[in-house]
């Protein structure tokens, strides 16, 4: 159980980190944190996982260039705007890559779970950041569940969000983001997130309790 709790905390932190990256522009102070011991150690720990190693290396290269980029905060803000906010942007909304009903499905999911994100997010609820943030919250709910049945329920909610939403549209977003990002910070981040989502789906398939025998 302790291993499950530790893994849950780490998974939630990863989802929330990615949610922050793709929801708002980074300040110069936030960019500076990428040169800190904590972030370097965090990325180094991810690189110990074989599937993540090439993606982490690409992101580390982008970070190294970003740290010495002239007017780095303004330059990265420009990248963010051109990539995600401009008229011909790579939309970070599921409905732009799937169908318009994706937004209504996310609204229904949040309503069923009794979760209100309006105080935290101004974006429509099918935004990548909202979906990633929700995954983090579902992970913590499973970790804090008072019974095995509740834990299984929250693990099932994670699988449903991952397979029914994120994995269904994120690969399209990832490809478009990488193709449209000449500097490469957000493209590298999208690549790492794509690897993580696939790995997390595999993890959930292993950690969910097996069906009871007849």
Swiss-Prot record:
Pfam families according to UniProt: Nitrate_red_del (PF02613)
Keyword Cytoplasm in record: yes
InterPro entries: Chaperone_TorD, DMSO/NO3_reduct_chaperone, HscB_C_sf, TorD-like_sf, TorD/DmsD_chaperones
Keyword Chaperone listed: yes
Source superkingdom: Bacteria
Subcellular location: Cytoplasm
Gene Ontology cellular component list: cytoplasm
Classification via PANTHER family: CHAPERONE PROTEIN TORD, CHAPERONE PROTEIN YCDY
Annotated function: Involved in the biogenesis of TorA. Acts on TorA before the insertion of the molybdenum cofactor and, as a result, probably favors a conformation of the apoenzyme that is competent for acquiring the cofactor.
Identification of the protein by name: Chaperone protein TorD
Species annotation: Aeromonas hydrophila subsp. hydrophila (strain ATCC 7966 / DSM 30187 / BCRC 13018 / CCUG 14551 / JCM 1027 / KCTC 2358 / NCIMB 9240 / NCTC 8049)
Gene: torD
